[in-house]
Design a protein with these regions (language model features):
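Nucleotide/phosphate-binding sheet-loop regions of phosphoryl- and nucleotidyl-transfer enzymes
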Residues: 1-423, 450, 456-459, 466-471, ...
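C-terminal accessory/binding modules appended to enzymatic or scaffolding proteins
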Residues: 13, 19-21, 433-475, 841-858
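Short beta->alpha connector loops at strand-helix junctions that form conserved
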Residues: 45, 482-484, 503-506, 594, ...
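Conserved alpha/beta-domain cores
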Residues: 98-99, 551, 561-904
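Long, charged amphipathic helices and adjacent flexible linkers at domain junctions
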Residues: 237, 399-452, 457-458, 526, ...
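Glycine-rich phosphate/ribose-binding loops and adjacent secondary-structure elements
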Residues: 364-366, 459, 463-474, 486-493, ...
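A short, small-residue-rich loop immediately preceding and capping a beta-strand
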Residues: 477-483, 501, 862
């Protein structure tokens, strides 16, 4: 553990720097770095992430004792640079206390502003500034934040609004004003007293008046917020380890609410929604930062072009816009120039799109934060390619800048243009996060989760979102808010998740208790359908048809770049020609798994399949299989043709036969009629197929060994289709894979059937086709005896679903009953069926690859389980020397990027 727990910064000097984010968190490291490169930052200090972890081991009293000397010295350092004193009524220093983990977690943890205020300090500040409105506005904000974050003042139930907001609304009503900033000094003073009384009533404790007590309460509250529900959920979603901890940054306050020459804002060096190289953001005059970020007031645009675009969407004329909603570029031109120059400097320094917070205090600009901005998948790809073209980063960095999972967003459906032209627009908001979303209205996060769990698609409608809504936002198709701008919590989090979001739709009136939203005099209830266009900000009544997204030139360029560096081929799992074509458009270089059993469930095919199962002689089975042969051949013909010139790996029949027969009374009666036998006979045969443990029973190669005629029919269908295509001038490249091998003898037996059948087929068609015979490694014994199996197999395909199941001894279908407890108790960090277990299952794979190649140096190896599209699993496969990974068609781009990242 680091001995030093507190690092100071200010006045162009800092004890930390940008590369210390693991210790100082992203915020603390960047505050230090901005000081060092000449960006104006208020002085302060950062308490390390190690101290957060220490807090959870030793508790609050001990951590305060351990930190006391360093924090007191750091406060004195800040006092000296600001020329004022913490807690001194005549010349007071106020501070902000903010969280900051090494990975950005917007809004997930807690912030407190204006700390250090009490009645005496407030009076002293009024005497010093001559601005009582500013002082008591700051004071009521501090009591509200401290009451919420440190003392736990929350709404009592989900229908209630924040208890402090309820008090504010009542006081505004009494005074007859609409906006917080129009409250009189007397009303603000009244709010301070009402807030304190509410805290006393609910918690039983007086609001702390000693600034030092306030500071320690806030520091420890930020540490506690690392383990709040929303932070834990966000970390789970983003794959951030609990043990990283959060740093705490304490910084001298600068005030955006000191009057008309003060302001606060959030800005991005490029568009976080579409990646356009356009400086953009929002600001509020006479406000504090939380007003912008929390979406409590809908702010104005920073740039003139941004303001004009906003006005056009909102249907506001240029004259009205310029008069009533001027951009910062127009209202504060000199400050805007300084802000623009500094944002450009920061982007060039960090060589990435920056998300920045700033405050203007009486005409002086201060930066409070910079970080690499959260962005949509579309923006991620465009920004990476643009920075590459601008010479700011190289090709390898461009590949590493893109998150594989976020490519999924580019493949999401968009609204069909014809359907959109006929749809009814019911309101217009801000296009906070692009995409198309249709769903039923819900108003609360827990309802969104419940409805989603029931298989319903929902749109979460809120006045504004807060970090507590994270789980609901994750479950929803899209988010609609009445308040908040493009940089509000809803917008930033939705973009990070790739969720469609329309914010600041001011014409909507949300009633949580009635569970209704009124839009232009029409009332929509919970459960009604609406559609959101996150790209334009338009909201529509009902459901609108969607279509597949069109991929951009930037996407193609990124994929070409990946292919330039990758050492591993990406194939797809496809059971139909349509799936094969889709995957090919996404760049799949072949098929890593075709499941033949999926082809048997069409009406005519299932009848023949059931006939085969019912037969109790070889002749009877062969007669039924002869009916299946043309169907199978036609299926393989379509897939091999769609993947002409590419490897197509076809798995022989794998599931147990009981999966193909009906288990309900009506289904058995229908089957009896189709087969021309009695229902009793059907029941008897179905019962005879029952197994105690079917997943380890009569399936895979065991079916082919007991019924070799099944293997022969499938081989005949595969090679017959290939021969026909070769005669037509195509280049089919079939691979025949024997599933569930545990011993080399099983593979030898099945191989002999395949080779004998191949000889017959080639003689019949008068043409030969090159093909390969391989096996699936999905039983631990097969992995352990890979050297022997490789003598008979030309390739190994690792079926990681079953290999994981048999190595852990977990049933994939039943793991949900205990996995949540395992995750909570940290027995498992991730679901091993989603992320490959590299320590156990991975070692079996590594051993099998190495031992197999010791016997057969040209042995090709690949992975075809669900893990084939999961980025960390793909990187592991590349590391152990696999030739390919195979995944579902829509995960092909994700796997291509992950494979390239493994190579660079």
């Amino acid at each position: 553990m680091s001995e030093k727990r507190v690092y100071t910064f200010g006045n162009g000097k800092a004890e930390g720097k940008a590369d210390m984010r693991n210790l100082l968190g992203g915020k603390g490291a960047n505050l230090a770095e901005m000081n060092l490169i000449g960006v104006p930052v208020p002085p302060g200090f950062t308490i390390t992430t190690d101290t957060c972890n220490e807090y959870y081991k030793v508790g609050q009293a001990k951590i305060v004792e351990l930190l006391a000397d360093e924090v007191n010295a750091a406060v004195a350092h800040t006092e000296e640079l600001m020329n004022c004193k913490f807690g001194d009524p005549k010349n007071p220093l106020l501070v902000s206390v903010r969280s900051g983990a090494r990975a950005s977690m917007p809004g997930m943890m807690d912030t407190i502003l204006n700390l250090g205020l009490n009645d005496e300090v407030a009076e002293g500040m009024v005497a010093k500034t001559g601005n009582p409105h500013f002082v008591y506005d700051s004071y009521r904000r501090f009591v509200q934040m401290y009451g919420d974050v440190v003392l736990g003042m929350k709404p009592e139930n989900k229908e209630d609004i924040d208890p402090f907001e309820a008090i504010i609304e009542k006081v505004k009503e009494e005074q007859g004003v609409v906006l917080d900033k129009d409250l009189s000094v007397e009303s603000l003073k009244k709010l301070v007293e009402l807030f304190k009384q509410a805290i006393k009533d609910q918690t039983g404790n007086d609001f702390p008046t000693d600034p030092k007590e306030q500071l320690w309460g806030a520091i420890c509250a930020v540490f506690r917020s690392w383990m709040n529900e929303r932070a834990i959920l966000y970390r789970k979603m983003e794959g951030i380890p609990d043990e990283w901890g959060t740093a705490v940054s304490v910084m001298a306050m600068v005030f955006g609410n000191m009057g008309e020459t003060s302001a606060t804002g959030v800005c991005f060096s490029r568009d976080a929604g579409n990646g356009e190289n356009l400086f953009n953001g929002e600001y509020l005059i006479n406000a504090q930062g939380e007003d912008v970020v929390a979406g409590i007031r809908t702010p104005q645009q920073i740039t003139k072009i941004g303001s004009q675009r906003w006005a056009e969407r909102a249907g506001i004329s240029e004259e009205e816009r310029a008069a009533n909603y001027p951009s910062m570029e127009e209202a504060m031109p000199e400050l805007y120039k300084e802000l623009d120059a500094l944002q450009d400097k920061l982007e060039k320094h960090y060589r990435d799109m920056q998300d920045m917070e700033f405050t203007v205090q009486e005409g002086k600009l201060w930066f409070l934060q910079t970080r690499n901005g959260k962005r949509t998948g579309t923006a991620m790809v465009k920004i990476a390619m643009d920075l590459l073209h601008e010479g700011m980063i190289d090709e390898k960095t461009a590949i590493l800048r893109c998150e594989p999972q976020k490519l999924d967003e580019l493949l999401h459906p968009v609204f069909d243009k014809l359907a959109l032209s006929k749809a009814k627009v019911i309101t217009q908001g801000l296009p906070a996060s692009p995409g198309a979303a249709c769903g039923q209205i819900v108003f609360h996060a827990d309802d969104a989760e419940e409805w989603h769990a029931d298989g319903k698609k929902v749109i979460m409608v809120r006045i504004e979102t807060s970090p507590e809504d994270l789980a609901g936002m994750s479950a929803a198709e899209g988010i609609l808010t009445a308040r908040g701008g493009m940089t509000s919590h809803a917008a930033v989090v939705a973009r990070g998740m790739g969720k469609c979001c329309v914010s600041g739709a001011g014409s909507i009136n949300v009633d949580y208790k009635a569970k209704t939203v009124e839009i232009e005099d029409v009332v929509y209830k919970e459960g009604d359908f609406i559609s959101l266009n996150g790209t334009t900000g338009q909201v529509y009544a009902g459901q609108i048809e969607t279509k597949a997204a069109e991929l951009s030139g930037d996407f193609k360029e990124l994929m070409d770049l990946c292919d330039k560096y990758t050492k591993m081929e990406i194939r797809t799992n496809a059971d139909t020609p349509h799936d094969a074509k889709v995957a090919r458009t996404f760049g799949a270089k072949g098929i890593g798994l075709t499941r033949t059993e999926h082809m048997f469930f069409d009406d005519q095919k299932i009848v023949a399949m059931r006939e085969m199962i019912l037969a109790d002689t070889v002749e009877g089975r062969e007669k039924a299989l002869a009916k299946l042969l043309p169907y199978q051949k036609a299926d393989f013909y379509g897939i091999l043709k769609a993947m002409d010139g590419c490897h197509v790996n076809i798995r022989l029949l794998d599931p147990p036969l009981h999966e193909f027969v009906p288990h309900d009374k009506a289904g058995q009666e229908t089957m009896a009629k189709e087969m021309g036998v009695s229902v009793t006979e059907i029941k008897k045969r179905v019962n005879s197929l029952a197994e105690n443990n079917p997943m380890l029973g009569h399936r895979g190669c065991r079916l082919g060994i007991t019924f070799p005629e099944i293997t022969a029919m499938q081989t005949r269908a595969i090679l017959g289709a290939a021969c026909q295509l070769k005669k037509e001038g195509f280049n089919p490249r079939p691979e025949i894979m024997v599933p569930l091998i545990g011993t080399v003898q099983e593979l030898k037996q099945q191989k002999s059937v395949i080779l004998a059948t191949a000889k017959e087929v080639f003689a019949e068609y008068g043409v030969e086709v090159e093909f390969e015979i391989g096996t699936m490694i999905e039983i631990p014994r097969a992995a352990l005896t890979a050297a022997k199996i490789a003598k008979e197999a030309q390739y190994f395909s690792f079926g990681t679903n079953d290999l994981t199941q048999m190595t852990f001894g977990y049933s994939r279908d039943d793991i949900a009953t205990f996995l949540p407890a395992y995750m909570e108790k940290k027995i498992l960090k991730v679901d091993p069926f989603q992320v490959l277990d590299q320590e156990g299952v991975g070692q079996l794979i590594k051993m099998a690859v190495e031992n197999g190649r010791a016997t057969r140096p040209d042995l090709r190896t690949g992975i075809c389980g669900e893990h084939g599209g999961e980025p960390s699993s793909v990187k592991f496969c590349a590391k152990v020397g696999m030739n390919y990974a195979s995944c579902s068609p829509f995960r092909v781009p994700i796997a291509r990027l992950a494979a390239a990242q493994a190579a660079v």
